[in-house]
Structures are given as C-alpha cells and as structure tokens.
C-alpha cells in the first residue's frame, strides 16, 4: 500500500444525513450524553452538548479546529472528566463503573501510541492483552494484521514503519479485541485510498453487527447513514448567537429559524 495521503483528501465527506437534522430520539439510546460541558485551560470549549447513539449508529464530529472534537472523544472514552453534564450507558452513569466502560469501547487517538522497540505483532499483542487481561490467540492477531495489510511486517520493529503503516497498526487494535463502541480521532491521517477503504469496510461490518462508532475527521470517510454533530453550535455564547437570533427576528419568520431553535434541532 502507498501510505501517502492524496492531496485531494483535504476535507470531510458529508455524511448522508449531514443536510438534515436528526429527529428527536424518544426511545432511549445505548450511549448518551446530556448537557456535557468541556473546560480546557480554564476556557469553556462547549456546553449543553447532547448526543444519543443506538446499536449500529455512527456519529461524525464536525467543527473547526479548537471546537472540542478531540476533547469530546476523550470525554466519551472516560479519559477526560467533563466540566458538567452526564455520560450514560443504558441510562447508568459511566463514572459508576469506569472499568466496564473501558472494556466496552476502543479509543484510537490522533497519536499512534506504539512501542517502537517492539515488533508489529508484539505491539498488537501487548495492547490486545491489556484489554483482554490475557494473552490473545495468535490467530486473532494475524487476522487483524492481515486485514490492514501488515501481516508481512509482523516481525518488523515498529520504529521502521512508515507513518501510514503505524496508523494502520493502531487501527488494527479495534479488530483484535471486540468492543461495542469505537471512538476514532482522525483515523484516516496518513492513509492512502486503499487503506481508507479498508477502514470504511471495517466500520461498516462493525455497525452491521450492532456496534457504534464516533469519528472526528478532516478526511473523506464514507459512512452510510451517519449523524453529524456540529460542535461549534455548542460553543459558549460570545455574542454571535445573539446577533444571529436578532437578525432572524428582524427578518421575521420567512422560513428562517432562530439560532437557538436551529441548535436545539441539531442535537442528535
């Protein structure tokens, strides 16, 4: 695989549902956030953020740099404490049982997190063993490496891998041990088109089996029936929202919605 990123892949592909707001979910989701607040460096990044994920759902986090996409993923993973709000699994706070929440989700951050002195297969066995609490079956490791085209590099030290190969090794973790929820931060960075297609297929299989996925990306990733979540709509008030609302009021109804109404309807 050629792991150089195509120059044309510089913007996220709009999810199929990106042009429409998600209908209100009254059935209760498996994984939900209610009124989430993120504070970073003493600054409120977002507030009042809600989301709901059910079996087979995909959520795409959208927004400019600094809007809190990576922070929200870390909150979802239990790695960052929210400044407010609730994170629930089947209606129960994930903070009540953080070990169970860790076991049910895979978080792949924008850093690869590899042990460069270990071989490719040793890296995958190490991380998978941590999750499973025991040495993983060799066949599981081989299958994950084969899926991402790394089987021929199994005995190579991780430090010798290209940027794209390192990213593929990080992503292979989600296949080497089962988890209901995948949290992926810029998963397509440094990947060529063939590798992105492999990732898309893996996500599609995961969803067909009832899994859920949340993705933050600036790259084109084809995700069928994915819900968009625009994080800049949950930024703390700086006067812009009020200006938009005043402008909408001045224009009258005429098909225009207030900023507040648009924000509420945009919540998944």
Predicted regions located by residue number:
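Conserved ABC ATPase "signature" region
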Residues: 125, 138-153
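Conserved ABC ATPase signature
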Residues: 157-164
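Q-loop/switch helix immediately C-terminal to the Walker
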Residues: 111, 116-132
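Conserved ABC transporter NBD signature motif
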Residues: 85-96, 100-101
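Helix-to-loop junction immediately C-terminal to a conserved catalytic motif
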Residues: 77
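Hydrophobic anchor residue at the start of the ABC signature
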Residues: 171, 210
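Catalytic Walker B motif of ABC-type/P-loop ATPase nucleotide-binding domains
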Residues: 182-186
């Amino acid at each position: 695989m050629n792991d150089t990123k195509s120059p044309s892949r510089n913007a996220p592909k709009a999810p199929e549902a990106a042009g429409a707001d998600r209908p209100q979910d009254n059935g209760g989701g498996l994984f939900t956030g209610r009124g989430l607040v993120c504070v970073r460096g003493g600054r409120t990044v977002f507030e009042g953020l809600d989301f709901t994920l059910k079996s087979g759902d995909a959520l795409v986090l959208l927004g400019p740099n600094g809007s809190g996409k990576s922070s929200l993923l870390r909150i979802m993973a239990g790695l960052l404490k929210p400044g407010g709000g609730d994170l629930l699994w089947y209606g129960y706070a994930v903070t009540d049982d953080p070990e169970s929440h860790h076991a049910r989700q895979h978080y792949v951050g924008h850093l690869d997190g590899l042990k460069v002195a270990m071989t490719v297969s040793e890296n995958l066995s190490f991380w998978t063993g941590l999750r499973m609490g025991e040495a993983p079956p060799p066949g599981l490791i081989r299958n994950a490496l084969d899926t991402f085209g790394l089987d021929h590099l199994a005995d190579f030290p991780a430090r010798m891998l290209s940027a794209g190969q390192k990213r593929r090794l990080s992503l292979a973790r989600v296949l080497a041990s089962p988890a209901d929820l995948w949290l992926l931060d810029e998963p397509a960075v440094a990947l060529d088109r063939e590798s992105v297609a492999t990732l898309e297929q893996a996500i599609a299989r995961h969803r067909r089996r009832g899994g859920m996925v949340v993705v933050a990306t600036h790259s084109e990733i084809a995700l069928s029936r994915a819900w968009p979540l625009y994080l800049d709509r949950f930024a703390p008030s700086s006067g812009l929202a009020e200006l938009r609302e005043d402008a909408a009021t001045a224009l009258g109804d005429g098909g225009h919605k207030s900023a507040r109404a648009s924000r509420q309807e945009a919540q998944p």
